[in-house]
């Protein structure tokens, strides 16, 4: 799935302009899975939320396609009411996007696709003052976007993120911001943002100040930490401080996508009942500033269990 004179500077202009170029939501509410009525309760529908100022309506539980190339799981998620799918150019060397693209072909307007591009800035974002390096960065972003569009078999991507941003220099870089503004104007993407696996508190504070980005994707769970299942590294965050910044993001119209949602382990809402991953997701969704989440689901049974948290 982290950057004077009497006139405003170019960067200030970019930040002011960003809020006005977010695409309008394509869809009305996606039909939910309706619970069978009984004599004792009214029917319940799945939870769909608006992704910040983008106006895009997303299922509050989304499918994270970073760990599978099995199209039946994408189809299963669709069949169970999920309309938000997270992928990235880096996953399976682009094959994740190819797989998602094959499944959504013919139903593009019924789904919301979030993808990511990985770019490298060197140490702490330094070394981009050279014009040739900036040109190279621009070309890298353009090439990555075009490859994603081709793989996904679409002419637009709903949300495009910088993958794994960790410094303010990255997210505030003029070349990056100009690229995102231009591609939004051209209709190639509807919204832009970044994902961050570390240093997210600093980046959250920065994005709340600049208000340039439409969407942010950060780790979030009841435990306030995670261990990366593949790389094995550990990360934790100051939950109260992160909560404060996420509330500000909601007020600023910034859509929040949660990741590492199950890395905190199962959860018991009352401390008595057996902890479950469904309740862990429900805990996340109890916070209104979470628009949706990208959850890796390895089976149809996991999909059905996780979807229950949306009721």
Give residue ranges: language-model regions.
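N-terminal secretory signal peptides and thylakoid transit peptides that target proteins
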Residues: 1-22
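Acidic (Asp/Glu)-rich catalytic clusters
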Residues: 77-79, 101-108, 150-153, 207-211, ...
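Active-site groove signature of glycoside hydrolases
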Residues: 150-168
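Beta/alpha (TIM)-barrel catalytic core signal, keyed to glycine-rich beta->alpha loops juxtaposed to Asp/Glu
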Residues: 11, 93, 164-311
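Glycine-rich, proline-tolerant flexible connector loops at the mouths of alpha/beta enzymes
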Residues: 86-104, 168
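Short, acidic/polar
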Residues: 68-77, 137-151, 199-206, 277-281
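Conserved, mostly hydrophobic/aromatic
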Residues: 51, 63, 85, 100, ...
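C-terminal segment of N-terminal export signals and the immediately downstream linker at the start
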Residues: 29-61
């Amino acid at each position: 799935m982290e950057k004077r004179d009497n006139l405003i500077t170019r960067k200030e202009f970019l930040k002011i302009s960003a809020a006005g170029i977010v695409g309008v939501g394509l869809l009305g509410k996606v039909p939910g899975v309706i619970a069978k009525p009984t004599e004792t309760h009214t029917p319940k529908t799945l939870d769909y939320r608006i992704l910040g100022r983008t106006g895009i309506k997303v299922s509050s539980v989304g499918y994270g396609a970073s760990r599978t190339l099995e199209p039946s799981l994408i189809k299963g998620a669709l069949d169970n009411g999920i309309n938000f799918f997270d992928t990235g150019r880096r996953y399976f060397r682009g094959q994740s996007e190819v797989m998602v693209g094959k499944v959504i072909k013919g139903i593009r307007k019924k789904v919301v696709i979030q993808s990511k591009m990985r770019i490298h800035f060197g140490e702490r974002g330094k070394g981009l003052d050279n014009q040739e390096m900036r040109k190279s960065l621009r070309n890298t972003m353009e090439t990555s976007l075009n490859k994603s569009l081709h793989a996904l078999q679409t002419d637009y991507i709903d949300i495009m993120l910088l993958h794994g941003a960790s410094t303010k220099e990255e997210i505030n870089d003029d070349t990056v911001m100009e690229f995102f503004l231009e591609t939004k104007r051209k209709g190639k993407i509807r919204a832009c943002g970044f994902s961050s696996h570390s240093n997210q508190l600093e980046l959250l504070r920065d994005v709340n100040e600049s208000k340039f980005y439409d969407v942010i994707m950060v780790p979030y769970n009841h435990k306030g930490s995670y261990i990366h299942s593949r790389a094995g590294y550990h990360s934790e965050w100051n939950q109260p401080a992160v909560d404060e910044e996420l509330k500000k993001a909601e007020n600023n119209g910034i859509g929040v996508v949660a990741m590492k949602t199950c890395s905190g382990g199962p959860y018991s809402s009352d401390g008595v009942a057996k902890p479950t991953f469904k309740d862990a997701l429900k805990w996340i969704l109890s916070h209104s500033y979470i628009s949706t989440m990208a959850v890796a689901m390895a089976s149809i049974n996991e999909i059905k269990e996780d979807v229950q948290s949306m009721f």
